[in-house]
UniProtKB/Swiss-Prot annotation:
NCBIfam families: maf. GO terms for molecular function: nucleoside triphosphate diphosphatase activity. It comes from Paraburkholderia xenovorans (strain LB400). The keyword Hydrolase applies. This is 7-methyl-GTP pyrophosphatase. The record marks 19, 80, 164 as: Important for substrate specificity. Its EC number is 3.6.1.-. Coiled coil: none annotated. One of its GO terms (cellular component) is cytoplasm. Gene3D superfamilies: 3.90.950.10. InterPro entries: ITPase-like_fam, Maf-like.
Length: 205
């Protein structure tokens, strides 16, 4: 049997996020990164869960669609939507928007929907899950919020706080089944999906 038949499918992360890339490196598997070109605008009437799942699948399918015919690949798509009081919270983009987000969330519980999709190009099958993390924010004064934003500039993350960095100081508690979900890529769920399709994550199974 040839090496090509024994070789596992390519693993591709469909994301431009350096945080997701760093998380995937923890699994110690070779992977490529491809940036999906999709419209990430939420649709009218969508729940946060539906938005996150739709975008995670769209990212994976967009990258898979650009692969050559016959390429065996497992494409990982992920998306995160934060919400409180029924309002969706996106990436702030600017300092002013980030400050407004943190002011609105202080003293509140915020839910982060971290959706994950694994698209198998060999069969066209999709595994998808939404991992919910409940985060209680501390009730901090504006001066503390400003100091945090100037220190970490978290303008590219939903909710304006990097829990893997200084942003942890803004939080009172985190409740989740997957400690990596809040950063943006639920590794417990991803490991389960990879093992389910026979990927040799822990060696030959």
């Amino acid at each position: 049997m040839s090496d090509s038949l024994n070789r596992p499918p390519r693993l591709i992360l469909a994301s431009s996020s350096p945080y997701r890339r760093e998380l995937l490196q923890r699994l110690r598997v070779p992977f490529d990164v491809a940036v999906p070109a999709i419209d990430e605008t939420p649709l009218a009437g969508e729940t946060p869960e539906v938005t996150a799942l739709r975008l995670a699948q769209a990212k994976a399918r967009a990258v898979a669609g650009g692969l050559g015919a016959g390429v065996a690949a497992l494409v990982i798509g992920s998306d995160q939507v934060a919400t409180y009081d029924g309002l969706q919270i996106g990436k702030p983009g600017t300092h002013a928007n980030a400050l407004a987000q943190l002011q609105a969330m202080r003293g509140r519980e915020v839910q982060f929907h971290s959706a994950l999709c694994l698209f198998d190009s060999r069969s066209g099958t999709v595994q998808a899950v939404d991992v919910v993390t409940r985060v209680q924010f501390r009730d901090l004064p504006d001066a503390a919020l400003e100091a945090y934003l100037l220190a970490e500039t978290p303008y590219d993350v939903a909710g304006s706080a990097k829990s893997e960095g200084l942003g942890i100081a803004l939080l009172e508690a985190i409740h989740s089944d997957d400690p990596t979900a809040l950063v943006g890529l639920p590794l417990i769920a991803l490991s389960r999906m990879l093992l389910a399709v026979g990927y040799p994550l822990l060696g030959a199974q």
